């Protein structure tokens, strides 16, 4: 899953893709480089972020979404915690809702059910009670009419967690994963990578990101969310080839 941030203040690439032309170019490039999904966000969720309004988030998204859906063939997700933004994005043909709050607002389930779209549910707490959270959210989503195949879980690397907690999660993904649901991991350029490597700037954390995501895939992750698509695709092709060879 390739990341496209339309924000001026994201922790690693803020301001890089936040005008119309560069955003469209990057979306097409992400697909060309081999991503299976495109995740578009217009709200920075870096540590200590201040949320922008629903109106501001939609102003950043609306023109780009409409064009991108006509330019790329891979499924597109919208990274938002506002139900109304998710609903509007569905009207533009977006395929997946990616909610970092873990669908704290149950309207997200109603929207996903109405539009028959995918939904990513993120664990956003500073504890390791992740599987029980996933099980609770799975039951809740089914009660709203969603099918298990629509639901993807994210253990929330870097969301209110310590470096050791993040490492524990990556090491124990097989124990966290629910077999009937896809598992997404997003460690790209995050604090755990920096903390292990002398805290280089986020843009210099690609090798560490690849190491973390390789471990994640070997431990059961189905999707990894990345900034550096070309390099991640190559690394995971090699990982999967070796892992699947007798």
Residue ranges: model-predicted function:
Residues 11-21, 25-26, 45-63, 67, ...:
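Active-site-adjacent loop and "lid" segments of alpha/beta metabolic enzymes
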Residues 4, 30, 34, 79, ...:
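Conserved, mostly hydrophobic/aromatic
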Residues 25-41, 219-220:
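Catalytic domains of carbohydrate-active enzymes, especially glycoside hydrolases
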Residues 38, 75-78:
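Flavin-dependent oxidoreductase catalytic cores
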Residues 35, 66-69:
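Generic short alpha-helical segment signal, independent of protein family or function
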């Amino acid at each position: 899953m390739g990341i496209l941030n339309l924000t001026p203040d994201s922790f690693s690439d803020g301001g890089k893709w936040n005008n119309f032309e560069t955003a469209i170019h990057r979306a097409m490039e992400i697909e060309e480089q081999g991503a299976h999904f495109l995740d578009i966000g217009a709200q920075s969720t870096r540590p200590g972020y201040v949320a922008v309004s629903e109106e501001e988030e939609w102003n950043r998204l609306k023109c780009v979404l409409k064009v991108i859906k006509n330019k790329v063939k891979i499924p597109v997700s919208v990274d938002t915690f506002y139900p109304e933004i998710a609903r509007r994005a569905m009207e533009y043909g977006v395929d997946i809702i990616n909610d970092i709050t873990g669908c704290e607002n149950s309207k997200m389930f109603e929207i996903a059910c109405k539009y028959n779209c995918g939904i990513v549910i993120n664990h956003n707490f500073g504890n390791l009670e992740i599987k029980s959270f996933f099980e609770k959210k799975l039951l809740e989503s089914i009660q709203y009419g969603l099918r298990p195949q629509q639901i993807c879980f994210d253990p929330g690397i870097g969301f209110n967690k310590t470096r050791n907690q993040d490492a524990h999660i990556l090491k124990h993904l097989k124990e966290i994963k629910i077999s009937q649901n896809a598992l997404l991991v997003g460690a790209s350029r995050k604090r755990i990578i920096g903390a292990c490597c002398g805290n280089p700037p986020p843009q210099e954390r690609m090798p560490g990101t690849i190491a973390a995501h390789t471990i994640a895939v070997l431990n059961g992750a189905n999707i990894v969310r990345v900034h550096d698509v070309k390099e991640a695709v190559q690394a995971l092709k090699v990982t999967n080839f070796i892992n699947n060879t007798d």
